[in-house]
Curated annotation (Swiss-Prot):
The keyword Cytoplasm applies. Disulfide bonds: none annotated. Keywords: Amino-acid biosynthesis, Cytoplasm, One-carbon metabolism, Pyridoxal phosphate, Transferase. This is Serine hydroxymethyltransferase. The gene is glyA. The modification N6-(pyridoxal phosphate)lysine is found at K233. It is an enzyme of class 2 (transferase). Its cofactor is pyridoxal 5'-phosphate. It comes from Aeropyrum pernix (strain ATCC 700893 / DSM 11879 / JCM 9820 / NBRC 100138 / K1). Pathway: Amino-acid biosynthesis; glycine biosynthesis; glycine from L-serine: step 1/1. It comes from the Archaea. The record marks H232 as: Plays an important role in substrate specificity. CDD domains: SHMT (cd00378). InterPro entries: PyrdxlP-dep_Trfase, PyrdxlP-dep_Trfase_major, PyrdxlP-dep_Trfase_small, Ser_HO-MeTrfase, Ser_HO-MeTrfase-like, Ser_HO-MeTrfase_PLP_BS, SHMT-like_dom.
Length: 439
């Protein structure tokens, strides 16, 4: 990176503008984004995001704040919680966590003290880093006991997991996570953890939009005591966290600690954008979630047909938005992800169940998600095209720069955000609109 002349502030501003614009063009117009943990907001939600709320605080709970000037965010936060909860079958909702990790931490800390045990899948079996001794769980001093995992079926080994829970008697267990292509056995694990006096947390960060759209089982209906999540993956809103509760006592305990333990300012500007996205999900969520899961299966089939080793063939490859590919024979996850990035196809390298944790920098697999390209209007035909482009890079060893040009042409057809309110007559003045009127 070329050094900036720090004595010339204008040159720094121009460089900042250049880098930001180049990123926007690259990721929004020229790339196929297949990162499983990302998505794009609608233009309508984006307008709601660009508000004066980004400058403001609202410590505490709605209508019981420690700051004045919160009359509108109070109403919006309650409304958003009702919208989100209505799609999860609960009115016990916390939207103040600013990320999925903070959502997890807020529940973990209430359920366990340092030295207590929790049964959770290891990170190479799909757990999020916040579930591990390397992340939030370890920072809280909670001991991770690895949940038995069935590598062949890419899922929890139910019989062994139940036996372990009965032996260990942990304070809580966690299902869900960062890589999972099939629903976890929520009922069975809930029964086991409840029998020893513990609680079940389901990390639905990746599948929240699929649950709301009816394409994934609702963990609250299957015994989970709390469902944590983020609002920017299959739920296509702004970055943020959320917790949904079945257990009212747990809700009250966690809610009391969100402020001041975990957040002071909970980033108010994301709340109206989350509300707009929730309305979009109520209107279009079933069609969207159905197309996402259908696209994922089609992409998996197409990749396999092109010669890639897609995990889960005997079970239909996937029921989520994710496709997992074993690329050991193609140079490993780090090399493959890098080659695809050079080709403007964005995926991430990922540990697979047989990898040791220390292989995190060069794991066996790549993880692919189709939720964003689905929102751009892509369907089965486009999944076949994407599979061909990936084959050109990883198997045929074509020049990534040439493939990148093909990707740019391909993306020109998909610039509109679907399953959104963008084609409705919804007027939302952004903060820039308001300020320009005052000039």
């Amino acid at each position: 990176m070329k050094e900036l002349d720090l004595s010339d502030p204008l040159s720094m501003v121009l460089k900042i503008a250049e880098l930001t614009t180049r990123h926007n063009v690259w990721r929004l117009r020229e790339s196929i984004n297949l990162i499983a943990s990302e998505n794009v907001m609608s233009l309508t939600a984006l307008k709601a995001y660009l508000s004066d709320f980004m400058f403001r605080y609202a410590e505490g709970k709605p209508f019981k704040r420690y700051y004045q000037g919160t009359r509108y965010i109070d109403e919006l936060e309650v409304l958003t919680g009702e919208l989100m909860g209505s799609m999860m079958g609960t009115n016990l909702v916390e939207l103040r966590p600013v990320s999925g990790t903070i959502a997890n931490a807020s529940v973990f800390r209430v359920l366990a003290e340092p030295g207590d045990k929790a049964v959770i899948a290891p990170v190479q079996a799909g757990a999020h880093v916040s579930h591990t001794k390397f992340g939030t769980l370890g920072a809280l001093g909670i001991e991770q006991v690895s949940m038995p995992y069935d590598e062949e079926n890419m899922n929890v080994d139910v019989d062994k997991a139940v036996k372990l829970i009965e032996e260990v008697k942990p304070r809580f267990a966690v299902l869900g996570g960062s890589v999972y292509i099939f629903p976890h056995p929520t009922r069975e694990i809930a029964e086991a953890i409840h029998s020893v006096g513990g609680k079940l947390i389901y990390d639905a960060a990746h599948v929240l939009g699929l649950i709301m759209g009816g394409a994934w089982p609702n963990p609250l209906e299957r015994g989970a005591d709390a469902v944590t999540g983020s609002t920017h993956k299959t739920f296509p809103g702004p970055q943020g966290g959320a917790v949904f509760f079945r257990d009212e006592q747990l809700y009250k305990k966690v809610s009391k600690t969100i402020f001041p333990w975990w957040v002071s300012n909970h980033h108010l500007h994301r709340i109206p954008a989350t509300a707009i996205t929730a309305v979009e999900m109520k209107l279009y969520g079933r069609d969207y979630a159905s197309q996402v899961t259908s696209n994922a299966r089609k992409l998996a089939e197409a990749l396999a047909a092109e010669g890639l080793k897609v995990i889960g063939e005997h079970l239909g490859y996937t029921r989520s938005h994710q496709v997992v590919v074993d690329v050991r024979d193609l140079g490993g996850g780090a090399k493959c992800a890098s080659l695809l990035e050079e080709s403007n196809i964005i995926v991430n390298k990922n540990l697979l169940p047989w990898d040791p944790p220390e292989a995190v920098k060069d794991p066996s697999g790549i993880r692919i998600g189709v939720q964003e390209v689905t929102r751009l209007g892509m369907k089965h035909g486009e999944m076949e095209e994407i599979a061909k482009l990936i084959r050109k890079v990883l198997i045929d060893k074509e020049d990534p720069k040439k493939v990148a040009e093909q990707v740019k042409e391909f993306r020109k057809q998909f610039m509109k955000i679907h399953y959104s309110l963008d084609d409705k007559d919804v007027r939302i003045d952004t903060i820039a609109d308001i300020l320009s009127l005052a000039q």
